[in-house]
Amino acid sequence: MASQPPPPPKPWETRRIPGAGPGPGPGPTFQSADLGPTLMTRPGQPALTRVPPPILPRPSQQTGSSSVNTFRPAYSSFSSGYGAYGNSFYGGYSPYSYGYNGLGYNRLRVDDLPPSRFVQQAEESSRGAFQSIESIVHAFASVSMMMDATFSAVYNSFRAVLDVANHFSRLKIHFTKVFSAFALVRTIRYLYRRLQRMLGLRRGSENEDLWAESEGTVACLGAEDRAATSAKSWPIFLFFAVILGGPYLIWKLLSTHSDEVTDSINWASGEDDHVVARAEYDFAAVSEEEISFRAGDMLNLALKEQQPKVRGWLLASLDGQTTGLIPANYVKILGKRKGRKTVESSKVSKQQQSFTNPTLTKGATVADSLDEQEAAFESVFVETNKVPVAPDSIGKDGEKQDL
């Protein structure tokens, strides 16, 4: 009896396991292409690489504004100092003295969508040029406002002096009116003089009295004219003194500030005390405030008092001239190093201390010289004993010398 073929599989028996192939037996498992190859599917031994730690938010992201404003104060802070003074006298300058933030430069981004790469590159490339133009414009505006304020102050002072002089002139008029009531005294005085001349008690004539009185009046008028002439020229001198003295004082203040800034960055070149650190990972700067470095580079860090208040970032220098921010978790602090100025000052202080103690130094020198003389004497004595000498040696003077 022939063998019968096996019955066809039932529908429930043809159900395949997910991931099974079309043929019999378990097929290959499928894997999404988005996942990519794993370590188990890579050929060969997997390479272990050091993954740099994540960078903390940059200063621009922490402050919510442009990174330029972190270490570079806005010029609006300088010109806003005239705002309180200019609101009463120069209201037209107050909108100009608050900067250009309303025009869109350095504005806060309200939308969550990041700008395109072209816009970012354009802003980064044009930032320095616009800042230079802005500083020049603010400088001219500040100078013009200063001159306008100086003119107003001098003019107000001049008006105050004129008001005082006007009050004094009015006071003089009032006193003249009061003294005019004493005309009777003058009449009595005139009659008394006439009586003295008639009786022969006074030998002066009336003409001489009139000439003397006129000379006194002319002298008083000349003094008043000279005082008025000299009083007319002092506002001009005061105005030019303020105009020339103001910029000079500003220049002195700015030069002092630049010297302080130069002294404050001497740590970068190693002149002052600084902290030494070694880079552990590579870092590429993305803004002008940051500096790039590679693993193994030695960096000079500013002291704690000179560090900016930015979380996770340190102020450092790589070449001794350019300073910038670096991530704190990318470097390893090695320690504090004294600057060259400190070392030189310590050497000078030691030399001064040695000069202030001459007796100790002199005693040490004398002791050293005595030791050297004794050592030299011993060496000479030993060499003399080694040299064979005749028992009777004749010196230069013809006498015998015993050694």
Swiss-Prot record:
<keyword id="KW-0225">Disease variant</keyword>
<keyword id="KW-0597">Phosphoprotein</keyword>
<dbReference type="InterPro" id="IPR035463">
    <property type="entry name" value="Pex13"/>
</dbReference>
<feature type="compositionally biased region" description="Polar residues">
    <location>
        <begin position="59"/>
        <end position="68"/>
    </location>
</feature>
<keyword id="KW-0472">Membrane</keyword>
<feature type="transmembrane region" description="Helical">
    <location>
        <begin position="175"/>
        <end position="192"/>
    </location>
</feature>
<dbReference type="GO" id="GO:0060152">
    <property type="term" value="P:microtubule-based peroxisome localization"/>
</dbReference>
<dbReference type="InterPro" id="IPR036028">
    <property type="entry name" value="SH3-like_dom_sf"/>
</dbReference>
<dbReference type="GO" id="GO:1990429">
    <property type="term" value="C:peroxisomal importomer complex"/>
</dbReference>
<feature type="region of interest" description="Disordered">
    <location>
        <begin position="1"/>
        <end position="68"/>
    </location>
</feature>
<keyword id="KW-0576">Peroxisome</keyword>
<keyword id="KW-1133">Transmembrane helix</keyword>
<feature type="topological domain" description="Peroxisomal matrix">
    <location>
        <begin position="1"/>
        <end position="134"/>
    </location>
</feature>
<keyword id="KW-0861">Zellweger syndrome</keyword>
<dbReference type="GO" id="GO:0007626">
    <property type="term" value="P:locomotory behavior"/>
</dbReference>
<dbReference type="GO" id="GO:0016020">
    <property type="term" value="C:membrane"/>
</dbReference>
<keyword id="KW-0728">SH3 domain</keyword>
<feature type="region of interest" description="Targeting to peroxisomes">
    <location>
        <begin position="145"/>
        <end position="233"/>
    </location>
</feature>
<keyword id="KW-0813">Transport</keyword>
<dbReference type="GO" id="GO:0016561">
    <property type="term" value="P:protein import into peroxisome matrix, translocation"/>
</dbReference>
<feature type="topological domain" description="Cytoplasmic">
    <location>
        <begin position="255"/>
        <end position="403"/>
    </location>
</feature>
<dbReference type="GO" id="GO:0005778">
    <property type="term" value="C:peroxisomal membrane"/>
</dbReference>
<dbReference type="GO" id="GO:0005777">
    <property type="term" value="C:peroxisome"/>
</dbReference>
<dbReference type="GO" id="GO:0001764">
    <property type="term" value="P:neuron migration"/>
</dbReference>
<feature type="region of interest" description="Interaction with PEX19">
    <location>
        <begin position="175"/>
        <end position="196"/>
    </location>
</feature>
<dbReference type="GO" id="GO:0016560">
    <property type="term" value="P:protein import into peroxisome matrix, docking"/>
</dbReference>
<keyword id="KW-0812">Transmembrane</keyword>
<comment type="subunit">
    <text>Interacts (via SH3 domain) with PEX14 (via SH3-binding motif); forming the PEX13-PEX14 docking complex. Interacts with PEX19.</text>
</comment>
<feature type="topological domain" description="Cytoplasmic">
    <location>
        <begin position="156"/>
        <end position="174"/>
    </location>
</feature>
<dbReference type="Pfam" id="PF04088">
    <property type="entry name" value="Peroxin-13_N"/>
</dbReference>
<feature type="topological domain" description="Peroxisomal matrix">
    <location>
        <begin position="193"/>
        <end position="233"/>
    </location>
</feature>
<dbReference type="InterPro" id="IPR007223">
    <property type="entry name" value="Peroxin-13_N"/>
</dbReference>
<feature type="compositionally biased region" description="Pro residues">
    <location>
        <begin position="1"/>
        <end position="11"/>
    </location>
</feature>
<keyword id="KW-0811">Translocation</keyword>
<comment type="function">
    <text>Component of the PEX13-PEX14 docking complex, a translocon channel that specifically mediates the import of peroxisomal cargo proteins bound to PEX5 receptor. The PEX13-PEX14 docking complex forms a large import pore which can be opened to a diameter of about 9 nm. Mechanistically, PEX5 receptor along with cargo proteins associates with the PEX14 subunit of the PEX13-PEX14 docking complex in the cytosol, leading to the insertion of the receptor into the organelle membrane with the concomitant translocation of the cargo into the peroxisome matrix.</text>
</comment>
<comment type="similarity">
    <text>Belongs to the peroxin-13 family.</text>
</comment>
<dbReference type="InterPro" id="IPR001452">
    <property type="entry name" value="SH3_domain"/>
</dbReference>
<dbReference type="GO" id="GO:0005829">
    <property type="term" value="C:cytosol"/>
</dbReference>
<keyword id="KW-0958">Peroxisome biogenesis disorder</keyword>
<dbReference type="GO" id="GO:0001967">
    <property type="term" value="P:suckling behavior"/>
</dbReference>
<feature type="transmembrane region" description="Helical">
    <location>
        <begin position="234"/>
        <end position="254"/>
    </location>
</feature>
<dbReference type="GO" id="GO:0001561">
    <property type="term" value="P:fatty acid alpha-oxidation"/>
</dbReference>
